[in-house]
């Protein structure tokens, strides 16, 4: 560019030449608008403070003692409740837990907990699976203790009372196996035709005979072949196929049980051990899928039921009596070289049946996985094929079996059990030979179990 060429002027230079721009900013500063105002308010960072004296304003505001609150000015940002993200899943779970916790009654809690129907593993306590007791212990977080708890009430003293009870049992045995003429049973139904009437006849007679020693039995309710069910979750698995493929779902279980008869009482039985008591027996941990047991998945209405409605006054369990079906027939298991599975299947039956019944009782009182029990729930069971009797006691210490609730849960449920004992050897000529008094003693001890608050009247 030559020196004689005209110089091009930009817009800013033209505005400055006309007196526009900076004089206006100066005028605004004179009126208290712009950077001096920001500095006076004490708002901004080091850059604003350097330009307009903000640092001095901040120090003066702190000296003035202005209060700064930690309350958020805006509501928190929540994930979408319909998204597929993990945050959205956590939000849905939290909202569901809050709805259940806010439910006013146990019936509403059970309705919400059983509302969603998904595929679940259906457990039948009498099963043909190998090592079924270890699987059932894992599903229910139950530790098995051989023998019976020491806190059971003592049996009756030898005397006229015990002799009378023995005559009641012998008469019931003769009634079903000697006096009555019965038609030829169907195939594999011979024992069922004899044992079911025996239990139905023996239990009411023992209850009525012992009602004078245990007033709780006088206010009890006897159910014949009730439906008992319990629904819960334990563990997690990934959905393998379908429109929900890849989702992580809890492993759901449903126990369907039908005892021969059961006794319900209006008062809860006393605990066998304290709630937080630690026992040396461990709960087996199985890392295989339940389908390897094998268990099969079905989808139908979830059920939590003790054999009566929630409003029934006798809402606590006392003793169940189970018939050992053909799946537990000793002769068949010995013939199939499965003699070692006889006691295993009996233990599995006791653990599964008592967990379902006792867990449903706790659910009737408003407890569930996120609101764990505050007191133990106790039930008893007797499993018999008419000749051999097995006795089990169960104490429910926790319902927190989900992955979320079981992270720091040190409690475990406890089941005590005996090996099967023979009641008698044979019946010949209207006489019961080889009668085992120990079995009768345990039957009486089970039926005499009661809370300490119940008044005892010995007739």
Task: Annotate each PLM feature.
Residues 2-6, 10, 14-24, 34, ...:
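Charge-rich, low-complexity intrinsically disordered linkers/tails
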């Amino acid at each position: 560019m030559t020196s004689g060429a005209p110089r091009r002027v930009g817009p800013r230079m033209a505005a400055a030449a006309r007196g526009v721009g900076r004089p206006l900013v100066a005028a605004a500063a004179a009126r208290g608008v712009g950077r001096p105002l920001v500095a006076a308010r004490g708002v901004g960072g080091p850059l604003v403070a350097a330009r307009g004296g903000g640092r001095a304003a901040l120090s003066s505001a702190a000296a003035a003692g202005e209060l700064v609150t930690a309350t958020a000015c805006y509501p928190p940002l929540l994930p979408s409740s319909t998204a597929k993200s993990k945050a959205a899943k956590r939000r849905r779970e939290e909202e569901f837990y809050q709805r259940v916790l806010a439910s006013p009654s146990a019936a509403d809690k059970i309705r919400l907990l059983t509302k969603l129907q998904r595929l679940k593993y259906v457990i039948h306590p009498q099963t043909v699976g190998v090592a079924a007791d270890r699987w059932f212990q894992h599903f229910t977080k139950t530790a098995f203790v051989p023998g019976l708890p020491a806190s059971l009430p003592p049996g009756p003293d030898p005397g006229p009372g015990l002799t009378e009870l023995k005559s009641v049992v012998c008469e019931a045995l003769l009634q079903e196996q000697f006096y009555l003429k019965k038609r030829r049973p169907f195939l594999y139904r011979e024992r069922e035709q004899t044992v079911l009437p025996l239990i139905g006849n023996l239990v009411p007679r023992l209850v009525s005979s012992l009602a004078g020693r245990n007033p709780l039995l006088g206010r009890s309710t006897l159910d014949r072949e009730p439906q008992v069910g319990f629904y819960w979750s334990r563990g997690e698995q990934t959905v393998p196929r379908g429109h929900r493929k890849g989702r992580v779902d809890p492993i759901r279980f449903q126990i369907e049980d039908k005892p021969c008869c059961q006794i319900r009482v209006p008062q809860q039985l006393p605990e066998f051990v304290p709630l937080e008591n630690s026992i040396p027996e461990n709960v087996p941990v199985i890392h295989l899928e339940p389908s390897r047991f094998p268990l099969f998945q079905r989808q139908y209405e979830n059920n939590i039921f003790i054999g009566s409605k929630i409003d029934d006054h006798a809402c606590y369990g006392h003793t169940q009596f189970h018939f050992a079906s053909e799946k537990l027939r000793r002769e068949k298991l010995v013939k199939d070289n499965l003699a070692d599975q006889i006691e295993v299947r009996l233990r599995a039956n006791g653990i599964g049946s008592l967990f379902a019944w006792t867990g449903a009782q706790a659910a009737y009182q408003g407890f569930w996985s996120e609101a764990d029990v505050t007191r133990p729930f106790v039930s008893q069971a007797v499993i018999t094929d008419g000749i051999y009797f097995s006795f089990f006691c169960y104490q429910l210490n926790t319902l927190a079996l989900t992955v979320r609730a079981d992270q720091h849960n040190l409690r475990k449920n406890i089941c005590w059990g005996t090996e099967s004992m023979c009641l008698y050897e044979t019946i010949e000529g209207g006489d019961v030979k080889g009668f085992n008094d120990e079995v009768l003693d345990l039957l009486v001890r089970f039926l005499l179990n009661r809370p300490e608050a119940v008044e005892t009247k010995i007739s």
